[in-house]
Amino acid sequence: MIYNRLKRFSLSTLVIAVCLLISSCGSDSSDAKKQMKAKADLQGAVIGVQLGTTSDGLATELEKKGDGTKVERYNKGADAIQALLQGKIDCMVTDEAPAKAFQRVNPSLQILPETFDASSFAICVAKDHGELKQSINHAIRILKANGVIDSIVNRHLERGIAVAYTPKTSAGKLNSSSDAPHPSDAKKMGPEALQKLGLKKSLRFATNATFEPFEYYQNGKIVGIDVDVANAIGDVLGVDVEILDMEFDAIITSVQAGKADAGIAGITVTPEREKNIGFTDSYADVRQVIMVNSGDAKAADAQQGFVDKFKSCFIDDNRYQYMLQGLGNTLIITFFAIIL
């Protein structure tokens, strides 16, 4: 009898505790209530960025001015978006293409019309692999001249196609009847040339597959603009391509250490990065934008699904630790209250 009463009470206590914790999610938001309408409003704002990106570097320069601007850094862009939806930050600075991808699934998000900064993406290569850099530059020039890169970018951005380029098989035939253009009359590098450079039989590209539409997962496979560009480069050079997913901050280090041959992950050339790594010619021009939440934090929180809300607030925010501690104390008190 006592055991059944204790069991029922424990279950009830657990359910109540979880519900209270989940319902409190979002209530610990910071004072991120600044109205964001233009670039000038970044002064004194709480800015969210993905750690190690160009956006991080640009926002950090604003933070250094000492005018109250604060930068919150996240391992993934999606984490920064979640913070924006919950009202924990005033805005997020990121590239326009991924900003539009986030906006498609979060209608309350708004991209301010004013450009925050303009930049270009390039592929990073170890400084002692000058011949590989020249070969990739050769491929980029061909792909630009043939309109292949423009086609890849447009098909992703305008038509929302996850795979806009179909690489050739080892037999030299297309895997499907894709309508995307393919390079022709290209000077092949071949696996033998790769081996002479001390590289593997395939060209290994490091990326960070959390940056839609440039690189992300769909149905368990890494897809996106950068993946298609990498495969097209492989076709020009006559080599197979391997895509390696890793944290963004690890890409340059991995290329330096030879764990990857090149890095393609929406990487902007900066003087700081050029101290440690080499860069190819640019293959895409982009602009940095400011993204804000046009609705209030409560409305965005209400739109969040139960499972997502449970994970972000109960697991990611470590609230389960408080619940377990409190539940343990409650059970001890309850146990002695019942038996006495």
Task: State what each model feature region is.
Residues 21-24:
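C-terminal motif of bacterial Sec signal peptides marking the signal peptidase cleavage site
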Residues 26-28:
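Bacterial signal peptide processing site
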Residues 30-41, 52, 106-117, 127, ...:
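Acidic, polar ligand-binding/catalytic clefts
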Residues 31-46, 167-221, 298-299:
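Immediate post-signal peptide segment of exported/extracytoplasmic ligand-binding proteins
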Residues 56-63, 67, 71, 111, ...:
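Ligand-binding clefts/hinges and TM-proximal coupling segments of bilobed small-molecule sensing domains
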Residues 70-74, 185-266:
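Extracytoplasmic small-molecule ligand-binding "clamshell" domains
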Residues 96, 100-140, 160-178, 209, ...:
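Periplasmic-binding protein-like
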